[in-house]
Amino acid sequence: MAAATAAAAPQQLSDEELFSQLRRYGLSPGPVTESTRPVYLKKLKKLREEEQQQQQQQQQQQHRAGGRGNKTRNSNNNNTATAMGGRPGSGDLAYLRSPAGLGRLSASAAESPVAGGSGGAAAVPAAGSKVLLGFSSDESDVEASPREQAGGGGGGGARRDRAALQYRGLRAPPAPPAAGEVTGGHPGERRKPHSWWGARRPAGPEPQPPAAGSDGAAEDADEELADGEDRDPEAEEPLWASRAVNGSRLLPYSSCREHYSDSEEEEEEGEEDGDVAPARQVLKDDSLARHRPRRSHSKPFSALTAKSGGSRQETSVQGGGALAMNDRAAAAGSLDRSRNLEEAAAEPGGGGGGGCGCDPVDSIPRYRAGAKKLAPLLSPPSPDGDSTLESPTGPLLKTNNHIGGGAFGVDSPGLYANSLPPGATAAAAPGTLRINHANHTGSNHTYLKTAYGKPKLCEPEEELLQQFKREEVSPTGSFSAHYLSMFLLTAACLFFLILGLTYLGMRGTGVPEDGGLIKNPFDETFGKIQESEKNLLMSTLYKLHDRLAQIAGDHECGSSSQRMLSVQEAAAYLKNLGPEYEDVFNTSLLWIFKNGKDVGIRCVGYGPEEDLTNITDVQFLQSTRPQMPFWCRFRRAFITVTHRLLLLCLGVVLVCVALRYMRYRWTKEEEETRQMYDMVVKIIDVLRSHNEACQETKDLQPYMPLPHVRDSLIQPQDRKKMKKVWDRAVDFLAANESRVRTETRRVGGADFLVWRWIQPSASCDKTLVIPSKVWQGQAFHLDRRNSPPNSLTPCLKIRNMFDPVMEIGDHWHLAIQEAILEKCSDNDGIVHIAVDRNSREGCVYVKCLSPEYAGKAFKALHGSWFDGKLVTVKYLRLDRYHHRFPQALTCNTPLKPANKHMNSLSHLRLRTGLANSQGSS
């Protein structure tokens, strides 16, 4: 009867109740629609039946649990099969993900002897994580709630906490103590805890008051007592004798990575529940679990796994906070925390832990359990379940890559998996961990380097860091790459500067070049001179050339006003050098005059442009190659280059000014043209309105003087500025507007030019009247910045199509639909249009046959002016569209405009015709 009632109850649930019930069972449902509701109801019915079966099995198991404390287990296979509710092999992930595996694992957990302790532990969840249905969900719910993470006050049992992950709210009633169990004395005396520093502590004088979750802790402690008595005797060895193993016992969630959600509400719900950050760890932890099928075979159980498992659960009971067996505490705290815990634990009394010897939770640096910014650095809960995953310090301590509980593995030097004894590589104590012997894998070291060496990043950066791990770029490489271009540019500039300076320095010493020219006289006269006179003549030319070059150089550098040297001064200069030079001076001068080539010395008469015909006409000698010092040449070159650069810049500025002025003139002409057209439209509206008023009131004159129309349209302060626009509008009306006739009338005793509106026929008036709902052109052109390159979905959401406050009547939305169909008249893929009549943003929803048709409609509508409003379009997901408009599921017939006249496009045709007429005129 109860089963029938439970089966029929889901049919009467509302959408909200159905959603909450599925969430209570650990599922992550999507939107409840007509198509998904039957699937969700069937799933809820099945889960309720499994829940009732588990409750019945738990009650039967609790009655048979009387003498379980003295029972022994025969082998490690039985041990691992019962401790975690008969979980499958580590590689059998498909079994964990299936609903059948969920029910069978839960049932086997209820039947195991460990599942029903003296306090009656709750049912163990099979998969250890939520089941994600194959629908698009609005939430990502892969992490327990803060209440469940707190563990009921910080001391909740492991199985109770694991059960809270999936079957929330299920608690079996406590069973009476068994006859074979110890009922007197302190719990610490009965359980005989072995602290991880190796010394047994006496129990405290008084038991600690139980916390909110102490009942579940006591149940797990009783179970561990029975487990500890049946373990191998080697388990009594101290924990530091064992090797620290990098045991990654993590398995991926039962909801595989393909079951993702692309809903926009997913981010909002995920932020409210705090469940987004752990979900991102699924991709990372799948890679950690790939080594498990070949590394988790059962082997003889060692002291390491046996005693560490026992100490871990016992300390979690009495210490008020669980120390995870495979902690990764170094990612959340410093390495010195382990030493602080060890020193504090070595003090007598254990600090109020009820004889446990562990520090209380308050002595540990406080971190928010399950905080979103810490969650990406922590490992997600494994399917086999850890007894301390949901404790208050669980997220803090679960980041230590060593076995032994707490921070034990941090301070144990030289303990690695490659030196473990043969018996230490067995599977962990009853299903609590699976050891991964790959202690030096690259992924693990990368993870630790990320956790230890980097500060906490914001959530988007953490997501990118976890999903796209790559080698860090060294600061030295980035520094050199940053300054490489600057260094190359500086080197190039220095090279050309040095080259130019060297060139300038070489230009200043041109004597050998000139000497080469002198040695080659280019005629036969030089060969007729005797050999003894040749050397003297060459020496005279050299001396004279150097003197003239020095004088010319001093003049160019501004240190001398004399540029040339007279013939008498040249003769006196050579005479001072020696009497032999004076004798050959005339011969040298004659040779220079007759040679006619540029040998560095030029003969000049009384004027610089005077033609010399005789040697007697030569009055001055001038150097054609001034010899200037290096700094003088550099200064002259700098002045020359600066002068030329200034001229170049001036030319560029003049060109820019000319282009700017031309652009200004073009822009001004375009603006004046636009203002002229606007003025024409205003004049026509005034004349049409005046004509309508004349038909209603016969006393009005059927014409209007031009100055009156101008004064009514242009403000007094703008009339001078708008005079040119007004004159162009008047000329345009006179030449191109047939409905306006210009006449001369006497008004008030003076002659005025007036405009008379000529009434057109009724049929023509109807076609020329611009309707209220019209497309008014494109606001901007579509490009990559404002339009996606590919069509995303077949559904569109259009904004600013109307203003619900200004709309009148009951069928105004039909005009909106008709306008969209007319605008997209060449699109045969629109199958559904919905107008949200109450939307303040003027939203219209459009569904097309395919994303290609939606992209075509997007390009036609986005950025257009409609009824004075700028229309914007965005893509909408198909499932959200069907959730909003279920009737659109069956729409597959393309829609066509009902009116063939295309009234909404008449304004565009009118403007196009006006522009064409203006261009032809």
From Swiss-Prot:
Annotated GO biological process:
angiogenesis; blood vessel endothelial cell migration involved in intussusceptive angiogenesis; nucleus organization; regulation of cell cycle; regulation of extracellular matrix organization; skeletal muscle cell differentiation
Q: State the Pfam families in the record.
A: LEM (PF03020), MSC (PF09402)
Task: Name the predominant localization.
Answer: nucleus
Key words, A-Z = DNA-binding, Membrane, Nucleus, Phosphoprotein, Transmembrane, Transmembrane helix
Enumerate the InterPro entries for this protein: INM_ESCRT-Associated, LEM/LEM-like_dom_sf, LEM_dom, Man1/Src1-like_C, Man1_RRM, MAN1_winged_helix_dom, Nucleotide-bd_a/b_plait_sf, RBD_domain_sf
Skewed-composition ranges (Acidic residues): 217-237, 263-275
Listed PROSITE patterns: LEM
In Swiss-Prot or TrEMBL terms, this protein is called: Inner nuclear membrane protein Man1
Q: How is the subunit organization of this protein annotated in UniProt?
A: Interacts with SMAD1, SMAD2, SMAD3 and SMAD5. Binds to both phosphorylated and unphosphorylated R-SMADS.
Q: Which residues carry this modification: Phosphoserine?
A: 28, 136-137, 140, 261, 263, 287, 412, 787, 921
Q: Give me the stretches of Polar residues compositional bias.
A: 308-317
Family matches, as SUPFAM superfamilies: LEM domain, RNA-binding domain, RBD
Task: List all Low complexity biased stretches.
Answer: 53-62, 72-85
- Highest taxon above the source species: Eukaryota
Span of domain LEM: 7-51
Q: Where is this region: Interaction with SMAD1, SMAD2, SMAD3 and SMAD5?
A: 709-921
